[in-house]
Amino acid sequence: MFNNTTTSFGSGPGIVVVPTPATTVPTTDFPGTTITSNSTFIIIGPPPPFPAPPRSIDLTPLKLIFVVIAFVAVPALVYALFFNGPCSSSRRNSSSSRTSSSSDDTPHATVDTPPITETTVTSESGGKFHKDTHSKEIGNECSVCLMVFTDSDELRQLSECKHAFHVLCIETWLKDHPNCPICRTDVSVKQQTEAPNVPVNVNGNVNRSGGNRRVSATSRDDDWRQGLPDASSLV
């Protein structure tokens, strides 16, 4: 039983005035404690909740991949635009200037080079290939058709560089290229016109058409070894 006496301390939210009990009442909140008739309790409500912590950034794996790609792609794009662009343009300008200068020089070379005619093509020294005699001096392969020389093959030797080829191969080559297929030595039209066609028979002798002089293949081989001009072209 409670009496009619009440006690209050201040006012405000969360403050509850409890009437003073008339008798001793045991409490269950605090074991071993009793409430007497002169006790007064003020019950304070729960404190206000703490503010919620800031939410962390929730990144899914797909969003994380996009973020990484953006961090890598943006610097690469900036580098390509501001650093690589001027270098590539300067390289293009230099290459175009070199191309224009080479194109300016090319017409002079084309004009100065005389056309290759049938007369100049067939005016080199030629003859039949003999393996035992010519394999060491002129080789065993035609550099135009890449075929191996065989005995009795009709060969033609350039007087400037002493390289030998099949007659048909070198004639076809010289119609389009004014140089040797191996060493790129320019074939002089004047020297070709002056050098007569020298047939070589199987026995190794060189016969001059229009003359009685015979030059042996042995002396010709000696000229090759010593670096002297071909003996057949001295007449």
Swiss-Prot record:
Catalytic activity: S-ubiquitinyl-[E2 ubiquitin-conjugating enzyme]-L-cysteine + [acceptor protein]-L-lysine = [E2 ubiquitin-conjugating enzyme]-L-cysteine + N(6)-ubiquitinyl-[acceptor protein]-L-lysine
Membrane disposition: Single-pass membrane protein
InterPro entries (UniProt xref): ATL1/ATL16-like, Znf_RING, Znf_RING/FYVE/PHD
One Gene Ontology MF term: transferase activity
Highest taxon, organism lineage: Eukaryota
The protein's Enzyme Commission number: 2.3.2.27
GO cellular component, one term: membrane
Pathway: Protein modification; protein ubiquitination
Polar residues biased stretches: 116-125
Membrane spanning stretches: 64-84
Keywords: Membrane, Metal-binding, Transferase, Transmembrane, Transmembrane helix, Ubl conjugation pathway, Zinc, Zinc-finger
Compositional bias (Low complexity): 88-103, 201-216
Stretches the record annotates as Disordered: 87-133, 201-235
Compartment(s) where it occurs, according to its Swiss-Prot or TrEMBL record: Membrane
Zn finger intervals (RING-type): 142-184
Any single biological process term in GO: protein ubiquitination
One Pfam family from the record: zf-RING_2
PANTHER family the UniProt entry points to: RING-H2 FINGER PROTEIN ATL16 (PTHR46913:SF1)
Family stated for the protein in its record: Belongs to the RING-type zinc finger family. ATL subfamily.
UniProt note: domains: The RING-type zinc finger domain mediates binding to an E2 ubiquitin-conjugating enzyme.
Protein name per Swiss-Prot or TrEMBL: RING-H2 finger protein ATL33
Source species of the chain: Arabidopsis thaliana (Mouse-ear cress)
